A protein has these predicted regions:
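Intrinsically disordered, low-complexity, charged/polar segments
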Residues: 37-74
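Short coil-to-beta transition motif at edge beta-strands of beta-rich domains
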Residues: 1-12
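Residue-level signal for tight coil/turn positions that link beta-strands
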Residues: 24-25, 54
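Short beta-strand-centered aromatic/proline hotspots
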Residues: 16-23
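Basic/aromatic-rich interaction segments and small domains that mediate binding to polyanionic partners
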Residues: 25-39
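His-enriched metal-coordination microenvironments in redox/metal-binding proteins
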Residues: 10-15, 71-74
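Hydrophobic beta-strand residues in large extracellular and virion-surface proteins
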Residues: 18, 28-30, 48
Length: 74
């Protein structure tokens, strides 16, 4: 299974890019690497719950609705 690694940079939908700062078994703490339409504050740290997609890779949803952007550990 592909997992998020601390220090890794991952690109999601709509060219959203994040850098993983910390990781636990169930959550990751990250910041955005560049401004984007979703979030302009790139210095703020965010924490989201990790979800598993078909045991192939980990993913996080950036919003609370299924249609909002997500980032996968590829």
């Amino acid at each position: 299974m592909k997992q998020f690694k601390v220090g890794g940079i991952y690109t999601g939908e709509d060219r959203i890019e994040i850098e993983v700062l910390k990781r636990t078994k169930q959550t990751i703490t990250f910041k955005y690497t560049k401004p984007n339409w979703w979030e302009e504050d790139t210095e703020k740290e965010f924490r989201k719950k990790i979800r598993h997609f078909n045991n192939n890779y980990e993913t996080i949803n950036l919003g609370s609705h299924w249609s909002e952007p997500s980032v996968h550990a590829n």
